[in-house]
Design a protein with these regions (language model features):
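Carbohydrate-active catalytic/glycan-binding domains of CAZyme proteins
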Residues: 1-315
């Protein structure tokens, strides 16, 4: 009998699942939407922690084994817009740690509602652990396509232009459905692109016909590579890639999308794979993402052996 490699199910090309996923502890409850940065010889992971409605921090060296969680930013019920905070991006710049995050306000009675409002907030830290936030959001939903929700900021510092660049998701409350773009000189005052949204669902691709959201942008080889979630419907999601010369226009989708989709029956990520974060380390590409089974999301690791992820882009 031929044995099937279960780590390869739902993975394109040289991608595979780490065999002992999920990588964060079960007793932490639901964790999701991570940012990973390298500081010296250590990796720092910032994550959304569902049971506390907070953003937490862990450290490690190999991308698999992590320290205990430390909450770095908690909800602030006095501001009126961040009863729940999550979906963060953290940059280290000029000796400071800069964080943009999603603040959510639920409308109506009950702990979880199907409607609400979300904005993007900003905080700074000297050590990456103790953050001081601005009281007001730095970006709010204003345009028709944004509806009442902005989420999932991804920010890069453009050294050549001396400017911050943000890609963000907007639209639906639980899962924003399109991706927009904005620029800022100080990371606080943002100007949205006049042609937003810059990236939309593709109705001819069943795996991303409903929603595209929560991207990471990775500059490489003269392109801006976008790793993003594509939704077939509200419950089934995959990881996909597109690229653009300027990160705004002319997006070209990877012809072998999706690169990651649900795992084998009964596995922790059988129904959906969400919110990618990719990093190159030791001759491999590491991609952390949320997997979902039933209503539970957990963070796992996917590995690409070899340096060239897209050698078959034009095949």
């Amino acid at each position: 009998m031929i044995e099937q490699d279960l780590t390869k199910i739902g993975c394109h090309g040289n991608w595979r699942r780490y065999k002992n996923n999920p990588i964060l502890k079960d007793d932490w409850g639901e964790t999701f939407d991570v940012t990973v940065i390298q500081v010296g010889e250590k990796l720092r992971m910032y994550l959304s922690w569902r049971s506390t409605n907070s953003i937490a921090f862990v450290e490690g060296v190999d991308g698999v084994h992590w320290s205990e969680t430390v909450i770095v930013l908690s909800p602030d019920f006095t501001t009126g817009w961040e009863d729940d905070i999550n979906r963060q991006i953290v940059l280290e710049k000029d000796g400071k740690y800069l964080m943009w995050y999603t603040g959510m306000k639920f409308l109506g009675a009950g702990e979880r509602m199907s409607s609400g409002r979300s904005c993007i907030g900003y905080a700074e830290s000297e050590d990456g652990i103790h953050f001081t936030r601005r009281k007001d959001p730095v970006m709010e939903p204003e345009e028709a396509w944004e509806k009442t929700n902005l989420m999932c900021p991804h920010v890069l510092w453009d050294e050549e232009r001396n400017i911050f660049r943000m890609w963000y998701s907007a639209g639906g409350f639980w899962e924003p459905d399109q991706i927009g773009y904005a620029e800022s000189e100080d990371g606080i005052h943002w100007k949205k692109h006049p042609q937003n949204p810059i990236f939309r669902p593709e109705p001819t691709h069943f795996w991303e016909k409903e929603i595209v959201s929560a991207c990471q942008i990775f500059p490489m080889d003269g392109y801006y590579y976008m790793f993003y979630i594509g939704f077939e419907d509200m419950y089934k999601a995959t990881i996909n890639v597109a690229r653009s010369k300027d990160g705004i226009e002319g997006w070209e989708r990877y012809p072998h999308n999706p690169i990651l989709s649900g795992g084998p029956e009964g596995s922790w990520d059988v129904e959906a794979v969400y919110k990618p974060w990719v990093m190159h380390m030791d001759g491999q590409w590491l991609l952390w993402a949320n997997g979902r089974r039933a209503a539970v999301e957990q963070v796992g690791l996917y590995i690409h052996d070899g340096d060239n992820m897209f050698e078959d882009w034009n095949d």
